[in-house]
Design a protein with these regions (language model features):
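Phosphate-binding/catalytic loop of phosphoryl-transfer enzymes
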Residues: 1-18, 169-172
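Short glycine/serine- and small hydrophobic-enriched flexible loop segments
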Residues: 4, 53, 142-147
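Flexible, glycine/charged-enriched surface loops at secondary-structure junctions
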Residues: 11-13, 61-69, 127-130, 153-156
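A contiguous, well-structured pocket-lining segment that forms one wall/lid of small-molecule binding clefts
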Residues: 17-98, 107-121, 148-151, 168-173
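Active-site metal-binding loops of divalent metal-dependent hydrolases
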Residues: 102-104, 130
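Conserved phosphate-binding/catalytic loops in two-lobed NTP-binding clefts
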Residues: 115-140
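A polyampholytic, Gly/Pro-enriched intrinsically disordered region
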Residues: 145-157
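A short, charged, Gly/Pro-tolerant segment at domain boundaries
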Residues: 155-173
Length: 173
């Protein structure tokens, strides 16, 4: 939604990231998500609303919106919300491996911040190649389509519980 406000094409993740790279940011002060009593929870609705309101206010008062700076400050606000929570989750669980995936893992600011935070914490970070960091829903749907074509159809008793531990996947590499 932030990409749409900035006039970027859909899907907006990659265009927003490219636009953000054109600025050092620090121009717009955007809110960070905070949920009292739930240090791992987050919501980006306030951030989205802030971007929309900022863009509309800037237009209403006749000022020019620095689209690149807003893209950068938005991406940094997402990263500043996400990365500390990921690190806190590692701390709470005692784990030393973090994996990021999906569209959010394609963002260069988030990737860089995760790399620095994991290096500082002495944990391993797994990031898929950028070409594999797309919309997870689309990937799951595409795989489901090919499974269906191959005749692999599950009945209604199928659940979403993992049947293989991530450690097995990590050790397979």
């Amino acid at each position: 939604k932030a990409a749409r406000v900035l006039g970027l094409p859909y899907p907006g993740g990659a265009p927003l990231d490219r636009l953000a790279q054109q600025s050092q940011g620090g121009v717009y002060r955007l809110p960070l998500s905070h949920v009292d009593g739930a240090p791992l929870d987050m919501s980006f609705s306030g951030l989205k609303t802030a971007v929309v309101n900022l863009a509309h206010h800037t237009q209403q008062v006749g000022e020019e919106l620095d689209r690149a700076a807003l893209a950068r400050d938005f991406a940094q606000a997402v990263s500043d919300t996400l990365v500390p929570r990921a690190m806190e989750a590692l701390r709470q669980t005692g784990r030393k491996v973090l994996c990021a995936a999906g569209g959010v893992a394609a963002n260069s600011i988030i990737r860089g911040d995760l790399e620095r935070a994991c290096a500082k914490a002495g944990c391993r970070l797994y990031l898929p190649p950028l070409r594999l960091c797309g919309d997870n829903g689309a990937m799951i749907g595409a795989q489901g389509y090919y499974e269906y074509l191959a005749g692999h159809v599950a009945d209604m008793s199928l659940n979403a519980y993992a049947t293989r531990a991530i450690e097995a996947e990590i050790n397979a590499d």
